[in-house]
Curated annotation (Swiss-Prot):
Superkingdom of source: Eukaryota
Organism annotation: Bos taurus
Lineage: Eukaryota, Metazoa, Chordata, Craniata, Vertebrata
GO molecular function, one term: zinc ion binding
Protein name: Adenosine deaminase
Binding site for Zn(2+): H15, H17, H214, D295
GO cellular component entries: anchoring junction; cytoplasmic vesicle lumen; cytosol; external side of plasma membrane; lysosome
A Pfam family: A_deaminase
Primary location: membrane
Sites of N6-acetyllysine modification: K54, K232
Length: 363
């Protein structure tokens, strides 16, 4: 029997990776079609090999992508299809608005140096990847009734890609793209300050491109500080280690910084140690501005309900808190103000709450 959802009302998700949210069936289909060897023959076997049941180190987690990304990257049909199927997945999660992120370069096999996943050079450029993802998302939006926007990721270990990422954000800003992100291994010393990333984020500020950064997931509070002060981020991906620096934490609370929290992910990646209080409990108790997100549901064998069940059953989260955090997620989304107001009105109505005059103030 299916589990009753922990929060059976419309939800907003702001932190989920497209390449970590692919159906195993789709991976197998393109592996076979393209003659690319995969470590399993059935969706169930593949899910178990790619998926995680217990915490792994960051390198072990990242190695999961090596199993299946060669089946998808460099293939136009596959790139568009995973975007379309992503929207279907989110409709099943009860999500009404989602921002999905990905690195265009990691799905390309042309005009990208180095070519990822040991692919031979082909003719799918990062620019065309964005166009294909946009098409898939827009078709999914139409068919499944979920509003979707996208975020393009710079990669910490590849600062040479970042200038193109911000230019693609500008080029496709009218077609789903709303922001830039910095993802990858934040333990790479000084990677927030690599000139390629700093210049791209400065250009984003100048051009009015919204900004988020993975920081303080496994990295220190100092990485968070760099994201806020140097990269001028508007939101933090994870941000858990902010709590190590009380001055920084209090400042970010006052500035109403939004934390994109991924509870189940944080357990499986070792970002959170289960014998300690989860940072999201502190965020809840302090009434901080945060959201709940899946991060990489394919690898974590999860749905958005997994994160809601975890916080409800193990951390005492209430329906009122779930409403509050989703309203804050909507307010912290990268939608233009008129669309943000529409989203908020939808949530207030669904939650049986009066709609305040202004959507500016977070709860």
């Amino acid at each position: 029997m299916a589990q009753t959802p922990a929060f059976n009302k419309p939800k907003v998700e702001l932190h989920v990776h497209l390449d970590g949210a692919i159906k195993p069936e789709t991976i197998l289909y393109y592996g076979r079609k393209r003659g690319i060897a995969l470590p399993a023959d059935t969706p169930e076997e593949l899910q178990n090999i790619i998926g995680m049941d217990k915490p792994l180190s960051l390198p072990e987690f990242l190695a999961k992508f090596d199993y299946y990304m060669p089946a998808i990257a460099g293939c136009r049909e596959a790139v568009k299809r995973i975007a379309y199927e992503f929207v279907e997945m989110k409709a099943k999660d009860g999500v009404v608005y989602v921002e999905v992120r990905y690195s265009p370069h990691l799905l390309a096999n042309s005009k990208v140096e180095p070519i990822p996943w040991n692919q031979a050079e082909g003719d799918l450029t990062p620019d065309e990847v964005v166009s294909l993802v946009n098409q898939g998302l827009q078709e999914g939006e139409r068919d499944f009734g979920v509003k979707v926007r996208s975020i393009l990721c710079c990669m910490r270990h590849q600062p040479s890609w970042s200038s193109e990422v911000v230019e693609l954000c500008k080029k496709y800003r009218e077609q789903t793209v709303v922001a830039i992100d910095l993802a990858g291994d934040e333990t790479i010393e000084g990677s927030s300050l690599f000139p390629g990333h700093v210049k791209a984020y400065a250009e984003a500020v100048k051009s009015g491109v919204h900004r988020t950064v993975h920081a303080g997931e496994v990295g220190s509070a100092n990485v968070v500080k760099e994201a806020v002060d140097t990269l001028k981020t508007e939101r933090l991906g994870h941000g858990y280690h902010t709590l190590e620096d009380a001055t920084l934490y209090n400042r970010l609370r006052q500035e109403n910084m939004h934390f994109e929290v991924c509870p189940w992910s944080s357990y499986l990646t070792g970002a959170w140690k289960p014998d300690t209080e989860h940072p999201v409990v502190r965020f809840k108790n302090d009434q901080v501005n945060y959201s709940l997100n899946t991060d990489d549901p394919l690898i974590f064998k999860s749905t958005l309900d997994t994160d809601y069940q975890m916080t409800k059953n193990e951390m005492g989260f209430t329906e009122e808190e779930f409403k509050r955090l989703n309203i804050n997620a909507a307010k912290s989304s990268f939608l233009p103000e008129d669309e943000k107001k529409e989203l908020l009105d939808l949530l207030y109505k669904a939650y049986g709450m009066p709609s305040p005059a202004s959507a500016e103030q977070c709860l």
